[in-house]
């Protein structure tokens, strides 16, 4: 399971001209689900995403996680993160989880975030989405479990 996390001043996701999720300061989480992923990996990745200390403390040092910083989370499914780009000029998506399994784990991940009392917004699984982001920093990290 892969999360590309970006520290955001604000972010939103729109599906068919409807804003489905919007946050102020916090994290935009692009989430990719791989074939071998399960709930245990989702739990571990959620723990890492929410605990990752990439927000500045009073001394300007990256020392706070999203909850300590008072931020929110916007989770957007992105199967392309599971692509194999090693060869050729076209990515292979054979490493990605089957759609039903990927959706179940995506929804599980989102629910785990919400259980941590963090405002968690979402896109719409498997939809064609427009994602807007003001990346603060820019600060972007690739987390994989």
From Swiss-Prot:
**Record motif Gly-cisPro motif, important for rejection of L-amino acids, residues:** 137-138
Q: What class of enzyme is it?
A: hydrolase
InterPro entries given for it? Answer: Daa-tRNA_deacyls_DTD, DTD-like_sf
SUPFAM superfamilies documented for this protein: DTD-like (SSF69500)
Presence of keyword RNA-binding: yes
Matching CDD domains, A to Z? Answer: Dtyr_deacylase
EC assignment: the record states: 3.1.1.96
Q: Which reaction does it catalyse?
A: glycyl-tRNA(Ala) + H2O = tRNA(Ala) + glycine + H(+); a D-aminoacyl-tRNA + H2O = a tRNA + a D-alpha-amino acid + H(+)
Pfam name, any one:
Tyr_Deacylase
Keyword set for this entry? Cytoplasm, Hydrolase, RNA-binding, tRNA-binding
Q: List the Gene3D superfamilies.
A: D-tyrosyl-tRNA(Tyr) deacylase
Does Manganese appear among the keywords? no
Q: Which GO terms describe its cellular component?
A: cytoplasm
> Subunit details for this protein?
Homodimer.
Role played: An aminoacyl-tRNA editing enzyme that deacylates mischarged D-aminoacyl-tRNAs. Also deacylates mischarged glycyl-tRNA(Ala), protecting cells against glycine mischarging by AlaRS. Acts via tRNA-based rather than protein-based catalysis; rejects L-amino acids rather than detecting D-amino acids in the active site. By recycling D-aminoacyl-tRNA to D-amino acids and free tRNA molecules, this enzyme counteracts the toxicity associated with the formation of D-aminoacyl-tRNA entities in vivo and helps enforce protein L-homochirality.
Q: What is known of its domains?
A: A Gly-cisPro motif from one monomer fits into the active site of the other monomer to allow specific chiral rejection of L-amino acids.
HAMAP family, per the entry: Deacylase_Dtd
Task: Give the similarity note.
Answer: Belongs to the DTD family.
Query: How is this protein named in the record?
Result: D-aminoacyl-tRNA deacylase
Q: Which organism is it from?
A: Salmonella paratyphi A (strain AKU_12601)
Per UniProt, what is the name of the gene that codes for the protein in this document?
A: dtd
């Amino acid at each position: 399971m892969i999360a590309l996390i970006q520290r955001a001043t604000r972010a939103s996701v729109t599906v068919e001209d409807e804003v489905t999720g919007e946050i102020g300061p916090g994290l935009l989480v692009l989430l990719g689900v791989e074939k071998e992923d399960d709930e245990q990996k989702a739990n571990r990745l959620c723990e890492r995403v929410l605990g990752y200390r990439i927000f500045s403390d009073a001394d300007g040092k990256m020392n706070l996680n999203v909850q300590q910083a008072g931020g929110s989370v916007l989770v957007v499914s992105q199967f392309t993160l599971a692509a194999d780009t090693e060869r050729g000029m076209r990515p292979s998506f054979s490493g990605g989880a089957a759609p039903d399994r990927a959706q179940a784990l995506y929804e599980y991940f989102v629910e785990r975030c919400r259980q941590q009392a963090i405002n968690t917004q979402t896109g719409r699984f498997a939809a064609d989405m427009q994602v807007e982001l003001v990346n603060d920093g820019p600060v972007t990290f690739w987390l994989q479990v």
